[in-house]
Curated annotation (Swiss-Prot):
Catalytic activities: tRNA(Ser) + L-serine + ATP = L-seryl-tRNA(Ser) + AMP + diphosphate + H(+); tRNA(Sec) + L-serine + ATP = L-seryl-tRNA(Sec) + AMP + diphosphate + H(+)
Residues noted as binding L-serine in the record, renumbered to the chain: 231-233, 285, 385
CDD domains, sorted: SerRS_core
Main localization of the protein described in the UniProt heading: cytoplasm
Role played: Catalyzes the attachment of serine to tRNA(Ser). Is also able to aminoacylate tRNA(Sec) with serine, to form the misacylated tRNA L-seryl-tRNA(Sec), which will be further converted into selenocysteinyl-tRNA(Sec).
One GO CC term, this protein: cytoplasm
A single MF term (Gene Ontology): ATP binding
Subunit structure: Homodimer. The tRNA molecule binds across the dimer.
One of the GO biological process terms: seryl-tRNA aminoacylation
Protein name: Serine--tRNA ligase
UniProt keyword list: Aminoacyl-tRNA synthetase, ATP-binding, Cytoplasm, Ligase, Nucleotide-binding, Protein biosynthesis
Keyword Kinase part of the UniProt annotation: no
Organism encoding this protein: Saccharophagus degradans (strain 2-40 / ATCC 43961 / DSM 17024)
Keyword Methyltransferase: no
């Protein structure tokens, strides 16, 4: 959530910044609600003051032996008027909060202009796409040849956009997860956390999925308003909700491996084949909680941590900075890592690493105690995938495929697969 003071004092500047997203801030609606809020706030304060004055007069009149009946009636009338005014103010503040909650984060100054992913700017590339001397197969056909990817049975069990893995491919999926976790824990010094896969509305509000993106979520059909997590970002970042950290504890680095569940409501007809876009998939998620002055450097660091996995696996990728029109609702700056997919002849997103400034922290009231002022201040939050496990599996199957239908196991994965060097149909 944006700082209400910023909206009150620099509304036009905020509106101008949000235009980089293609978002038109309704300044008139905000101004009208804010003026009504100030009027009601003033009325409440005036009624409170008048009630307090009249209450004191009752004591004086009683001491002087005067009839206090009329004064008691006046105080009762003021109490009723104040209660009504406070109720109206509370309702108006709810309207104002709903409006502000739907406003996306401001983008950082160096975020490029643009309307869509076509306008994202490439920052760097690593590795060279392999040249094959045979016809490249996509991961669906590679998996079918090995006998380890079964979409038909998954569809029978559940429906479209689910997958079933078995044998060496299931083992490779697990090995990728272990490689990611061990790298981030042992080398990058993240603390592993195990979190709930079901969250409440407050958690989803805190990270910015609610109220705007409810259609993308799987909601449990009971009266508790629980949801399956769309990303580990939600439960992991919400560890900080309502907390005040000592400055000496920062930065806090968490890593978690979880399944993720998304309805893909806006993706009808896109990536319907294979594992690229699934209702259920797994990720290893990185989250950092830092002081405001450290957040942009932390974004660079976290992105490098995600890149390290791709480099260990020898997978060609590129790094792009998202333009204003493609950046997420809560983010102020985002890098995407896109891995080379040979069957498609292009790079596809495998990790999105974002700095949120204090946007999520304000919604969650996640703070740290400034050692100089001894006052609590809002944290900055950063998160990213390190990496999406299923898409990494796709990239390995395609980039390491061989003409005979087998798949070479990257050296970094071999210790996690009992020293195997190749997977092939049994």
């Amino acid at each position: 959530m944006l700082d209400p003071k910023l909206l009150r004092n620099q509304l036009n500047d905020v509106a101008e910044n949000l235009k980089k997203r293609g978002y038109e801030l309704d300044t008139q609606a905000f101004t009208a609600l804010e003026e009504r809020r100030r009027t009601l706030q003033t009325a409440c304060e005036s009624l409170q003051q008048e009630r307090n004055t009249r209450s004191k007069n009752i004591g004086k009149a009683k001491a002087a032996g005067e009839d206090i009946g009329p004064l008691l009636q006046e105080v009762d009338n003021l109490k009723s008027a104040l209660a009504e005014a406070e109720q109206n103010l509370q309702a108006l503040q709810g309207e104002l909060e709903a409006l502000v909650s739907a406003i996306p984060n401001m983008v950082h100054d160096d975020v490029p202009a643009g309307k869509s992913e076509d306008d994202n700017v490439e920052i760097s590339k690593w590795g060279e796409p392999k040249t094959f001397d045979f016809e490249v197969q996509d991961h669906v056909d590679v998996g079918a040849a090995i006998g380890g990817l079964d979409f038909e049975t998954a569809t029978k069990i559940t429906g479209a956009r689910f997958s079933l893995m078995r044998g060496d491919i299931a083992s490779m999926h697990r090995a990728l997860t272990q490689l990611m976790l061990n790298t981030h824990i042992d080398e990058h010094k993240y603390e592993e956390v195990y979190v709930p896969y079901i969250v409440n509305k407050d958690s989803l509000y805190g990270t910015g999925q609610l109220p705007k993106f409810e259609e993308d979520l799987f909601k449990l059909t009971d009266d508790r308003e629980f949801y399956l997590i769309p990303t580990a970002e939600v439960p992991v970042t919400n560890i900080a909700r309502g907390e005040i950290f000592d400055e000496s504890q920062l930065p806090v680095r968490f890593v978690a491996h979880t399944p993720c569940f998304r309805s893909e409501a806006g993706s009808y007809g896109r990536d319907t084949r294979g594992m690229i876009r699934q209702h259920q998939f797994e990720k290893v998620e990185l989250v950092q909680l830092v002081k405001p002055e450290d957040s942009l450097n932390a974004l660079e660091e976290l992105t490098q941590h995600a890149e390290a996995i791709l480099q260990k696996l020898g997978l060609p990728y590129r790094k792009v900075v998202l333009c204003g029109g493609d950046i997420g609702f809560s983010a102020t700056k985002t890098y995407d890592l896109e891995v080379w997919i040979p069957s498609q002849g292009k790079y596809r997103e495998i990790s999105s690493c974002s700095c949120f400034g204090d946007f999520q922290a304000r919604r969650m009231m996640a703070r740290y105690r400034n050692s100089e002022t001894n006052k609590p201040e809002l944290l900055h939050t950063i998160n990213g995938s390190g990496l999406a496990v299923g898409r990494t599996l796709v990239a390995v199957l395609e980039n390491y495929q061989r003409e005979d239908g087998s798949v070479e196991i990257p050296a970094a994965l071999q210790p996690y697969m009992n020293g195997k060097t190749v997977i092939a149909k049994a």
